[in-house]
Amino acid sequence: MKWLINAIDGLALILYRISGLLLILMMLSVVADVASRSLFALTQGSLDLTFVGGIELVKYGLLFAMLFAFPHTVDKGQIVVDLFTHNLAPSTLRWFDGFYTFCFGIFGALLCWRFTEAAEASRLSGELTQDLLLPLAPLYLVSAFALGMLALRGFSCGILELMGEKELMGKKDVTA
């Protein structure tokens, strides 16, 4: 069982690092788009290096950056309002944390299922993105994979927390 948890954690960490790379690529895309439009304006249209789909690249980059970050960070700091929890026993707090994380697993599983259905519907209809004319089915499948990882990590972390074995998760915890 420990190898499965380590495999899920390792894959979540890889997705987390890809998420950071996507944020950098989004930034570079925005800078390139603004620079090319400024150059176009400065040269009064004689030098056209603008490209179509910059906003769409950022839109899908942000989608994947967020979805890829979720699996690794699902157990990294839930906000707890001390006003309600400061008098609770540690075992009760552990139960709240575990239940909350497990519910994130359910949420990820439901979204994974919905994105998988959307991918199939998109594949059958041939739906494309608006600017770049990319097929949406593969984008939905990548989203479904990331949400499936969120579900697996939410379930595994939540169950370990409920069982009081959260230290199994933290043995090889690397944040970035």
Model-based region annotation:
Residues 1-176:
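Alpha-helical transmembrane segments and membrane-interface helix-loop junctions
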